[in-house]
Amino acid sequence: DVCSSDLFTRLIADGTTEFDRVRAGYEGPLYAEISPRTFSILVRTGDRLSQLRLRKGNPAPSDAALRDLHQRVPLVHGGDTSANIDGGVGISIDLAGTGPEALLGYRAKHHADLIDLSKIGHYDPREFWEPIHAHGDSRTLILNPDDFYILVSRERVSVPPDFAAELVPYDPLVGEFRVHYAGFFDPGFGYAGVEGQGTKAVLEVRSHDVPFVLEHGQVVGRLVYERL
């Protein structure tokens, strides 16, 4: 969705010491901390800003079980990629570009108009986003501090119907950038059975404080699968 609103929300419950956590047996109100980053946002009662996931036990399979699942139902597709499984499936960045214009993705414009979340399909994405194209054979992209980008994964991935998945940070030590703003993948994402071709993951990316250089094929996150 090229009209991503770049809206950061966190769940708060009474008596808790962490964001986005609700203790077992909790009964009471829930609150949302809402922080628009790039665009000014208009919200109304009933707008959906967060997704709640309920977990019981440890639904994440081991790496061995994930490799076995990949053998039976491919999780990663593409002749130039293979399943990098270590604490989840490694997700790398595609900076080769697609189409005749070698499109890499989009960067959010500054000082754009207000976004009314109730007006679905109303806005022209070009009013909020500028395209980024590959230049020559460098296959690198310099992230400007605190700019917001939409890029895609090099891998085409699948989530079987009896699984869900979440994109988590690869390693905080590799740099001050974040790629998992839109981190949840629903059951059946990119899935069409054994013969499926998968779908590229859309990555919402921001660098913090300092410029950061991304290179084509650099691992930026891991897709952690959870059995339903």
Regions found by a protein language model. Give the residues of each.
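DUTPase catalytic domain/fold
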Residues: 1-228
